[in-house]
Amino acid sequence: MSHPTIESILQENRLFYPPDDFVAKARIHSLEAYNALYEKAKADPAAFWGELAQQELEWFQPWEQVLDWQPPNAKWFVNGKINITYNCLDRHLKTWRKNKAALIWEGEPGDSRTLTYAQLHREVCQFANVLKQLGVKKGDRVGIYMPMIPEAAIAMLACARIGAPHSVVFGGFSAEALRDRLIDAQAKLVVTADGGWRKDAIVPLKDQVDKALAHQGVPSVENVLVVQRTQQPVTMVPGRDHWWHDLQKGVSADCPAEPMDSEDLLFILYTSGSTGKPKGVVHTTAGYNLYTHITTQWVFDLQDTDVYWCTADVGWITGHSYIVYGPLSNGATTLMYEGAPRPSNPGCFWDVIEKYGVTIFYTAPTAIRAFIKMGEHLPRARDLSSLRLLGTVGEPINPEAWMWYYRVIGGERCPIVDTWWQTETGGHMITSLPGALPMKPGSASKPFPGILADVVDLEGNPVGVNEGGYLVIRHPWPGMMRTVYGDPDRFRRTYWEHIPPRDGQYFYFAGDGARRDEDGYFWVMGRVDDVINVSGHRLGTMEIESALVSHPAVAEAAVVGKPDEVKGEEIVAFVILEGSATPSDALQQELKQHVVNEIGALARPAEIRFTDALPKTRSGKIMRRLLRSLAAGQEVVGDTSTLEDRSVLDRLRQGS
């Protein structure tokens, strides 16, 4: 009996090796070393993770059992006692890192600040004491709705220090979206700012908090702490609202880290599904600490001299894991930038790299596509010679965008780590280890040691080499989410019941289509929800989009299916052109034929729609379900709280 899978139709055969001088200094410096680590972890996962936990982290009390697995519920480092901020801060004060830069911050208007590990520790302890004075106790949830300023990281670390789980809400979310998340988390206190800078404009954060809390909208919230960032006037509600700087003044910097059970709740982070209520992803303390620590160290090949910059916002999991917790646990210097490329300074990212001598640069494919559109002249006008490693995160990267990144930003000398992971996984799952594995443009490479990734059909049968299927993980890992906050049934249904268990083995269902090639490299083909069924052939959107973007006139493309009586679905492509290209019927035909030449007639788009923008979430992901509705001429329904620019939908409707 055959079971539906996803057809793979795009071939990419280019191969790139890390430079010899990079390999010579790398922590994991050969394919043989990677294979040995991977096989060691596969043979005895508990021993592998237990050994790393002992070597890499400091514990208040040792664990009794590495893993207690009662599918789908995992407990890691059972009955161990630990505090993530002790590992991120206190232990470094006993070494030369005490006076090392922990956090470099660059504000959009050009102001800046650097905090050493000693200074960051002091500010975290002071703010932890402020929280205690306001009645926040171990187990109380704290909402954080902040711009990208040091106080955002300080607030997260202060919460973790006293055992108060934080729930960071991205500062671009509306008051309604903020209210929903604060209600679900039953937050006792909210930390915010008067405003933040983004693209030369002030984002009025405190006003949004006031709207969210209006008319007892979130009855659990007792206090609001406000950082002065932009200095614009805001309403301060007596008895509820307090200025951060007033309460921080003169507060003791003595606040011992609370011993936390390994499985104590560390944070809740909300991720939107295509429709319905956002899911509160739960991460706990010890497993998350270890997993973000070791993935940061190995994937970015961290060295003591690195200046590491992840361009994400702390409101997303990438900011949690790879701006705050992972780098600081390793004693690294992590850079935080408040703004984004904007008309007044489109080359601001390259200015930051040049100014601080950034050595590791980690950004999203959507940003890389924007850089391509802005032109090579911007990065070429800056000195980017400090860079030694590049990374991508958030979605699969088209091979041509990968090549541009490698050539223009990395100067063909910086390895690229293309990292596949999710809010739910806590950290990197499939990724290159830069000194060990050759790179294939567009491939996430191989599973991280300890991650048993596979590609299967809907019955759990492994599919063949280069056959598309469903990406699954066959064994628990320390960084995995523990549940959906307050909804364990949703956790089980969403992640563990799509594919039935086989021989007692459960499958974590990632929701992505993928294939594995003859070298064991994984190629992520996009969300399963985005698969298009054309005449019985199930095609992933990613490969068709990659073919379109490989045309010199195309800056970005998004592909969706549109219902068709004969074929089931037909392919509709929304295309943003490069600056010099102009829309025309001739170009439409040329692009359709280009896809045929690259992939085959099966993938020929029925329609090419030119546009100047695509509907994206505030983290830069294309909202294809909205495009599906537009392509089909239907009304857009469902949750649009994550949509960054609502005017894009109106422009797309007018152009259809």
Curated annotation (Swiss-Prot):
- What stretch or stretches form a coiled coil here? none
Give binding positions for CoA.
198-201, 318, 535
Q: Which residues of this UniProt protein bind ATP?
A: 394-396, 418-423, 512, 527, 538
Cofactor(s) this protein requires: Mg(2+)
Q: What is its EC number?
A: 6.2.1.1
Spell out where the chain crosses the membrane. none
Q: Give the reactions, separated by semicolons, that this protein catalyses.
A: acetate + ATP + CoA = acetyl-CoA + AMP + diphosphate
Give a yes or no for keyword rRNA-binding in this entry: no
One CC-aspect GO term:
cytosol
N6-acetyllysine modified-residue sites = 621
- What CDD domains does the entry give? ACS (cd05966)
Which Gene Ontology BP annotations are present?
Answer: acetyl-CoA biosynthetic process from acetate
Q: How is it modified after translation?
A: Acetylated. Deacetylation by the SIR2-homolog deacetylase activates the enzyme.
Q: Where does Mg(2+) bind?
A: 549, 551, 554
What GO molecular function annotations does the UniProt record carry, in alphabetical order?
acetate-CoA ligase activity; AMP binding; ATP binding; metal ion binding
Q: What does this protein do?
A: Catalyzes the conversion of acetate into acetyl-CoA (AcCoA), an essential intermediate at the junction of anabolic and catabolic pathways. AcsA undergoes a two-step reaction. In the first half reaction, AcsA combines acetate with ATP to form acetyl-adenylate (AcAMP) intermediate. In the second half reaction, it can then transfer the acetyl group from AcAMP to the sulfhydryl group of CoA, forming the product AcCoA.
What is the recorded name of this protein? Acetyl-coenzyme A synthetase
What gene does the UniProt entry assign to this protein?
acsA
